[in-house]
Amino acid sequence: MFNFGKSVNRILIPDLSEQAVLSSVVDAGQNYLAQKNYDMMESLDFYYNQNLDKHIEQWFASESLSQVPPFIGSCVPRFAKARMMIYKENAKRLIAGEVNDDYNQLTYRINTKTREFSELAWLLGCCYMKSMYNERKNRLEYEILPNVQEYYVRGETEPFAYSYEIENVDPTKKRFVFWSEERDGVQGMHFEYDEKGYRFAVKENSEMINPYGIVPISKVAFSKASYDVTRAGLHIAIAMTEIALSVRFRLGQPVFTGLEEGQSKLSAGIDNAYILPEGATFNYVAPGGSLIELIEATKSMANQVAENNQLRIRWGESGGNAPSGEALRIMEIENLEARKSDEAIFREFEHDRYEIDRRILEVHNILTLSEEYAVDFGEVTFPMSPKEEREMLSWKLDNNIISQKDLLLYYNPDMSEEELEMKMSGIMQENQTVANSQQPQSSFQRILNGASPTSS
């Protein structure tokens, strides 16, 4: 049976009966050990710059790395940030056609989390986000789940349940969480379980029922993972470690020939003199190869992977004047086109996440929200000259694309509502004063203003 792009964490069950579900949960707990995805864990390590030594050290003899530590770079998170520009600017979320401040105040760190989530989804090929309500702090919080198992009823394409591993006090005993949705009259379930399939209630939920009726997990899936970026990060780290070793050995390795056994250990130093027997030699031997060639070979690895992912690299030593905003836009055209494709994927994710948030807030009696939801992803901007920026803003203002209020927020996004109202009030008064001074006045008005009437 061929597996065309399907996750190894996809679990099929024959029906929705509790017995079938629990049997699948037991199998899933055991399969977590057998199907642990090394590539995914490696990608996570490179993205978060953690545990990198263990990935590099295995490619070197133990004696080699006693000379220099492994080289650790940050190319993987930089690739991910450069490629995923969908949340580069904060998304504008509209409920019933307008910004809902009550909802926005409840969504804790949503912009930061969605930005990180999008980068991981692109890198791993698939990622999950769990929405949860923190009753102690009265807010919605979000947790990124890189590795989740999906449960499908045979013949269906939409999962009805998810499970994922959580931290446990005893690291030798794994613990998991299970969520299933209410479907076909069967109540959803929610509980923790261990590798043997023993279930445990979550907090006071002794009946192990899903209080929301839906699974509070949203998902983004790409057609492929970007593991080539992780592998390039590993190759670059290995190559740079080799270069560091080469630099260390450039001073040369002292070599003696013609010495008798027992005379091989000598003290080095400029204040030590060596008396060599007849026929013996002493010199320093340095490794061959050009460091410039090694560096260029390493850069070519990064360039190749960047091109394959619609990216480009501008190296620090690149000369010439800085490119203009339009030139940058042309150079980034492939990445901008890829971003347009990403919008459809993340628009669906945003709607799924909002429906989950809406349901959670209703169950906790916090807020009732409209079903009408829209998201406006911020446009990618490129640097402009002051003249170009003024002309652009002036054109938008003249054509009613932006208002004076938008213009003030453009220059000071952190301006409070009170500040904004004061500024707008001052601008209106100034405009009114200018308008009055330019209006023709009657003879009576000029008399009141202290001017003598003119004869017609």
What are the language-model segments listed below?
Residues 125-130, 308, 406-410:
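Amphipathic alpha-helical protein-protein interaction segments
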Residues 1-140, 452-456:
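Extended, helix-rich architectural segments
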Residues 422-456:
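Extended, compositionally biased alpha-helical segments that mediate assembly or anchoring
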Residues 412-421:
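Short, basic interhelical loop/turn and adjoining N-cap
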Residues 200-334, 364-367, 384:
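Extended, charged amphipathic alpha-helical segments
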Residues 42, 51-62, 274-308, 325-348, ...:
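Extended, non-catalytic structural segments that build the interaction scaffolds
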Residues 355-366:
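Substrate-recognition/cap regions that form aromatic- and gly/pro-loop-enriched pockets
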Residues 119-123, 128-219:
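Extended, regular secondary-structure scaffolds
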